[in-house]
Amino acid sequence: MYDHFNSPSIDILYDYGPFLKKCEMTGGIGSYSAGTPTPRVAIVGAGISGLVAATELLRAGVKDVVLYESRDRIGGRVWSQVFDQTRPRYIAEMGAMRFPPSATGLFHYLKKFGISTSTTFPDPGVVDTELHYRGKRYHWPAGKKPPELFRRVYEGWQSLLSEGYLLEGGSLVAPLDITAMLKSGRLEEAAIAWQGWLNVFRDCSFYNAIVCIFTGRHPPGGDRWARPEDFELFGSLGIGSGGFLPVFQAGFTEILRMVINGYQSDQRLIPDGISSLAARLADQSFDGKALRDRVCFSRVGRISREAEKIIIQTEAGEQRVFDRVIVTSSNRAMQMIHCLTDSESFLSRDVARAVRETHLTGSSKLFILTRTKFWIKNKLPTTIQSDGLVRGVYCLDYQPDEPEGHGVVLLSYTWEDDAQKMLAMPDKKTRCQVLVDDLAAIHPTFASYLLPVDGDYERYVLHHDWLTDPHSAGAFKLNYPGEDVYSQRLFFQPMTANSPNKDTGLYLAGCSCSFAGGWIEGAVQTALNSACAVLRSTGGQLSKGNPLDCINASYRY
């Protein structure tokens, strides 16, 4: 379940898994020599990034670490919400819910705490799936090719991934071949191949790129796609984890890197909920004090400088002074609440622009706890992908050893424009009933089972809109065309610790400051970058193979 394989990420040509494995055996990411004073460190945000950074700093010998959290819980956008405290096994993953093993930094911590990832996430085509398209239902058996109507776009996309793209006067290496290069350690070849894709498509949206690729002279798979029909079909089918029509305006290279990094393959579900990782991190004890007891549940306002010190001011009026600060809050909070982009006190103009302009998606979810696992008993699809209002429907079995247990149905998972539609229905009962009616128009039998336990909509229907979440103002980073350079600036910001003349003592972290927005791996990677930056800039010694010494900006975005 946890077997490690080499899985460097394409944009950084580095794998955090081996470094973490070595550090686990040697004691930490670094250390301080006897007599070297250790810094006082504030971490803004007690999500996975903040908790990982705190863990590694405390293991390395930093004594004074304070985490600030504006919510009333730890975890941030990692949020396994329980329907009912009397039924704690039934959860709604409001944030991250799919976990690919190629996320080796994340899987290191899952293994460390013995958190099971044995269950496959019910992605389309992995389980029995139904595609609802233009008022008709199409059955897609588990492990088989999709229905004939979708065959051309499916095979075309698969051919692009496995064969690459033939240009006039040249070709681009198959994305899956780039993945193989990464896994086999042929990093220079992988970098050259990825730069080729960047050179051609860095300024193209996902939609513009696939139109160029599949209507040109050399379409992968051999068949040109028809406009607009095949592109509408592809938007509903997606690339492995559901329909991508709502993100057609995202950057093509942003989507392609997910495939190359393996994030769309073998996605796992965590039966105990991903919040169990946040809880296990917080339960660790250092010097007789639990990590969770270092969390101050208070919202940080402005972050400012006074000589060589950094001032944290909470909205309750408290001020505290620190030597180093790691900020893991959302990019919107960095700009509007912490005021980090107001001057060059902490961030260069280039980095400040990246903070301000990086695109965050809107996303909404609605879950129902049903009386039974009706899809199993009645041989109904486990997953539905629809061109209607519901978009993605996923049936989740959190107690497979109990046939008579309840079911959890993610009735609606939407992105961007589709998520914005949900904002017009803030009342969850109304929203739920509208979604059920939408589904009933095509599959009335399935829809008839979508009633919460005991008819209790208040308790057994859970929903969340990330766009209006005051702590996030968006779900996750998803670059628009031309914005990959923003991810580069944000990811490498902690590397200023290598240059004393550029180092301000404040470091950015979180998945929106990575090349893996929306994936916990990005949160883990940037947490480690920032923790290493604290050690390096305050007289600590980093372990060999650390990211500050091994990762370089390798691409022209």
Curated annotation (Swiss-Prot):
Lipid biosynthesis among keywords: no
Residues forming coiled coils: none
Origin: domain of life: Bacteria
Reaction(s) catalysed (UniProt annotation): L-tryptophan + O2 = indole-3-acetamide + CO2 + H2O
Flavoprotein keyword on record: yes
Family recorded in the similarity comment: Belongs to the tryptophan 2-monooxygenase family.
The protein's name: Tryptophan 2-monooxygenase
Annotated organism of origin: Pseudomonas savastanoi
Gene giving rise to this polypeptide: iaaM
